[in-house]
């Protein structure tokens, strides 16, 4: 039996008996939860992993470990803010106790105002502008997390992703069966866009400014008429749009309903050679 399998068994059993767990709980359960969160924090394990077939496998027991930590940890003063600012919370800062050597080894840039909670992993060459990374999240190498962006609990952000200013990536710990929101490698998410409810943005996709995608959002390919729910195909260029509404009872035209529109699809080489503005400008002016 592997070490991770042992941890999983302990966490699963503890979660089934979670009503008996509180801030006074000691021993194996507390040690297992704390160790699991430490492994998440270091990026040695992650809540979701992409399989060879392109599907994502979610380790539900890791989400359960995060939830158990809220029962185990009391409210306390959290230090580490700018100019000695502190908070009242159950989750310490990822940077608690860090010194220059720790930041050097981590290899990412964190500007003043960036908040990362313990158990979130940030890979080398990531740039964190003033932003918020919630617990259990995974931000892979070379990604830009721009100003006022939020990366929700257990969200998975790929390599060389650009999350523009004010972007919201949804978190999902409850309901427990829900999957985390996933942004795959080389995606561009435009300013003030939102991706939530376990939706997946596939590799190389471009979302223009102000695109909102949840599990009820219709994502319509303008060329083929195909409708996607919960997933944007790879190398798609997506902008906000609307669908004609049903007529009102009095026969008048009903209000249009929001949708997201795939205005074009490109191959990997075109995506690499073409600027984001060029990809969006040509089609949105039609």
Swiss-Prot record:
Family: Belongs to the transferase hexapeptide repeat family.
EC number(s) recorded for this UniProt protein: 2.3.1.117
Classification via SUPFAM superfamilies: Trimeric LpxA-like enzymes
Superkingdom assignment: Bacteria
Annotated Gene Ontology cellular component terms: cytoplasm
Keyword Ribosomal protein: no
Binding positions for substrate per the UniProt entry: 109, 146
Keyword Cytoplasm: yes
Primary location class: cytoplasm
MF term (GO), any: 2,3,4,5-tetrahydropyridine-2,6-dicarboxylate N-succinyltransferase activity
Name of the molecule in the record: 2,3,4,5-tetrahydropyridine-2,6-dicarboxylate N-succinyltransferase
Subunit structure: Homotrimer.
UniProt keyword list: Acyltransferase, Amino-acid biosynthesis, Cytoplasm, Diaminopimelate biosynthesis, Lysine biosynthesis, Repeat, Transferase
Involved pathway(s): Amino-acid biosynthesis; L-lysine biosynthesis via DAP pathway; LL-2,6-diaminopimelate from (S)-tetrahydrodipicolinate (succinylase route): step 1/3
Catalyses which reaction(s): (S)-2,3,4,5-tetrahydrodipicolinate + succinyl-CoA + H2O = (S)-2-succinylamino-6-oxoheptanedioate + CoA
Any one Gene Ontology BP term: diaminopimelate biosynthetic process
Cellular compartments annotated: Cytoplasm
